[in-house]
A protein has these predicted regions:
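"Short basic amphipathic alpha-helical interaction patches in structured regions
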Residues: 67-68, 80-81, 98-107, 144-146
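Glycine- and acidic-residue-biased ligand/ion/polar-headgroup-sensing regions
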Residues: 69-71, 79-96
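Residues that flank catalytic or metal-binding motifs in active/ligand-binding sites
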Residues: 49, 81-83, 124
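A short, N-terminal "cap"/entry segment at the start of jelly-roll beta-barrel domains
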Residues: 1-60, 144-147
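Short acidic-glycine-tyrosine-enriched beta hairpin
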Residues: 57, 93-116
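Double-stranded beta-helix
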Residues: 120-148
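Short histidine-centered beta-strand/loop micro-motifs
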Residues: 55, 64-66, 74-79, 96-99, ...
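Conserved hydrophobic/aromatic beta-strand scaffold that supports enzyme active sites
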Residues: 50-52, 63-65, 84, 106-108, ...
Length: 148
């Protein structure tokens, strides 16, 4: 347990013994995952960086924080599987949709939807947490697959 409970109603509750079953994989705990420390990010495009948080080759899934400190672009692409996004700060959206995400907004992307991610100029950097399954397929100007 990270710290002892004092007044919480559950303070006398004991942890599960042997909580990691034989088929359990290691968990990940990252303090301050959406940090603005750019040393922890890798270039995703010329204007957007990614902080990988978790990658599972066996499940073909990953989680990351995308960040753009000024106007940014992740060019046309689609995901053959669903994607979940939660906006931490800043402002972003898809050119193909009529919404703009700001801090606290949640987005569910349906499988196979093509889009162009744009980050807007804002007083705070655009930071969004993404959960992705499968590849990201780049598209040309007409929406046809152009690479993985």
């Amino acid at each position: 347990m990270p710290e002892l409970a004092t007044r919480e109603f559950w303070k006398d509750l004991q942890p599960i013994p042997d909580c990691f079953k034989p088929d359990a994989k290691p968990e990940v705990y990252l303090r301050n995952a959406p940090t603005e420390d750019e040393r922890l990010y890798v270039p995703f495009t010329e204007t957007v960086k990614s902080r990988p948080l978790w990658i599972s080759p066996s499940e073909n899934r990953w989680c990351d924080i995308l960040m753009a400190t000024s106007a940014g672009l992740v060019n046309r692409h689609y995901h053959p599987h669903e994607v979940f996004a939660y906006t931490i700060s800043g402002k972003w959206g898809y050119l193909e949709h009529d919404w703009t995400a700001t801090a606290g907004d949640f987005v569910y992307e349906t499988p196979g939807e093509g889009h162009t991610l744009v980050a807007y100029e804002h007083e705070q950097p655009m930071r969004a947490f993404f959960i992705v399954k499968g590849p990201l397929v780049w598209l040309d100007e007409k929406g046809n697959a152009d690479g993985i």
